[in-house]
């Protein structure tokens, strides 16, 4: 079972009300973001669909990307259309189903940016394990991020490792319970400069489906 796909797409994004009018660094003169995206991908399933893998290469060319930059006509920061972007990269993934209960997966992405994009990492690697038996399910995974731009003006980058875990129990067809832990290694990191992300956090809840 092998599949090859080629795709070309054109897209745009209008600036949001928040970006234009709400709170600094708002800017009512923002223009829509526009881009062309080209992708070529290959995927295959083997061993009675227990093993799957894929590879994807892409090229993105766009203009008017909205980012936060120093105000050229005053102090502070201002949302601005930054001009053109030209990025390309590759993504790879693999997964294996040991049995109906256990499975593993991993993926890696590499991004080259001619013009750096805020909150976009150059390298991202993830590995995870999934468990599902009866009414119980659980998963855990570790993600490594390298070269994530948090401030384009200072070309500031972040590197960090995140470990997450979650589990759930389906009591009935309508009721389930879940728990989740994020950033269990309590990493100190930022996605946007000046806004530290939470350290280890835990949550739980109930889902009711009608």
Task: Show where each model-derived region lies.
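Short, solvent-exposed loop/turn segments at secondary-structure boundaries
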Residues: 115-119, 152-155, 190-194
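One-face residue pattern on beta-strands with alternating periodicity enriched for small/polar residues
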Residues: 164-168, 176-180, 203-207
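Flexible, solvent-exposed coil segments and beta strand-coil junctions
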Residues: 15-24, 67-76, 106-110, 134, ...
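A generic beta-sheet turn/junction motif
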Residues: 10, 44-48, 131-135, 171, ...
